[in-house]
């Protein structure tokens, strides 16, 4: 059976760039990283989180003032892995613009909301979902109680983060996250998770206009 990672990497396009030293080939994601674009794609877990954090820190070292763009298409995942990305977004100096393509569910929606104010966007057909954290544990009664307390503590902390970035009241956030709440891009804007729904990239004012 073929390694799925190897199969995936074989499908990643390569782009060739001309430099003063000749041609240089990049995989498409490395080339976009040069443009300060990061992708948060798929389930949020420790390995993915580590790569995103490393890219954020690298781009800060490259230029501590220039904007970083984060494209999100994620169903969510491990809370602590997502919080590692969240904390790094708040820690670094460059502003982080977020854009939802596809979906931003669970921790994905929190990362979408955590972008720089007025720089959080969603494409028209993006779907956003928020809910409270969930988990399961087996063991002794005392250990089960401790894990339940930890989940409740995480729930409170996540609610506070949503309050900070959406402008909603704590009670409104708690009510919204009680069950899976699915939002269209426009609903996510009204809720405060994104600032704007965009369907076209803004034109470059410096670009030459086509003549008739």
From Swiss-Prot:
Catalysed transformations (reactions): Hydrolysis of proteins to small peptides in the presence of ATP and magnesium. alpha-casein is the usual test substrate. In the absence of ATP, only oligopeptides shorter than five residues are hydrolyzed (such as succinyl-Leu-Tyr-|-NHMec, and Leu-Tyr-Leu-|-Tyr-Trp, in which cleavage of the -Tyr-|-Leu- and -Tyr-|-Trp bonds also occurs)
Kindly list the GO molecular function terms attached to this UniProt entry: ATP-dependent peptidase activity; ATPase binding; serine-type endopeptidase activity
The EC number on file is: 3.4.21.92
**Could you tell me where this protein is found in the cell?**
Cytoplasm
Q: Which Gene Ontology cellular-component terms appear in the entry? A: cytoplasm; endopeptidase Clp complex
Q: Which domain of life is it from?
A: Bacteria
Tell me the Gene Ontology biological-process terms attached to this UniProt entry.
Answer: protein quality control for misfolded or incompletely synthesized proteins
Q: Does the keyword Zinc apply?
A: no
Question: Which PROSITE patterns does the entry link to?
Answer: CLP_PROTEASE_HIS
The family note in this entry says: Belongs to the peptidase S14 family.
The UniProt function text for this chain reads: Cleaves peptides in various proteins in a process that requires ATP hydrolysis. Has a chymotrypsin-like activity. Plays a major role in the degradation of misfolded proteins.
* Assembly, per entry: Fourteen ClpP subunits assemble into 2 heptameric rings which stack back to back to give a disk-like structure with a central cavity, resembling the structure of eukaryotic proteasomes.
User: What is the protein's name according to its record?
Assistant: ATP-dependent Clp protease proteolytic subunit
Q: What gene is behind this protein?
A: clpP
């Amino acid at each position: 059976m073929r390694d799925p990672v190897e199969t995936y990497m074989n499908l990643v396009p390569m782009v060739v760039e001309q430099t003063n030293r000749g041609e240089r080939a990049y995989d498409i994601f490395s080339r976009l990283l040069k443009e300060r674009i990061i992708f948060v794609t798929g389930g949020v877990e420790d390995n993915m989180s580590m790569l995103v954090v490393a890219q954020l820190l690298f781009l800060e070292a490259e230029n501590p003032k220039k904007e970083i763009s984060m494209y999100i298409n994620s169903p969510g995942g491990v809370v602590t892995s997502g919080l590692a990305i969240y904390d790094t977004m708040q820690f670094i100096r460059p502003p982080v613009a977020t854009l939802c393509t596809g979906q931003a569910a669970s921790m994905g929606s929190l990362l979408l909301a955590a972008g720089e104010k007025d720089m959080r966007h969603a494409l028209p057909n993006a779907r956003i979902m928020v809910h409270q954290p969930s988990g399961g544990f087996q063991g002794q009664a005392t250990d089960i109680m401790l894990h339940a307390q930890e989940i409740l503590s995480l729930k409170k902390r996540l609610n506070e983060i949503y309050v900070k970035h959406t402008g909603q009241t704590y009670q409104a956030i708690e009510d919204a996250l009680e069950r899976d709440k699915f939002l269209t891009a426009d609903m996510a804007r009204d809720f405060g998770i994104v600032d704007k729904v965009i369907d076209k990239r803004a034109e470059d004012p410096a670009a030459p206009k086509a003549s008739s």
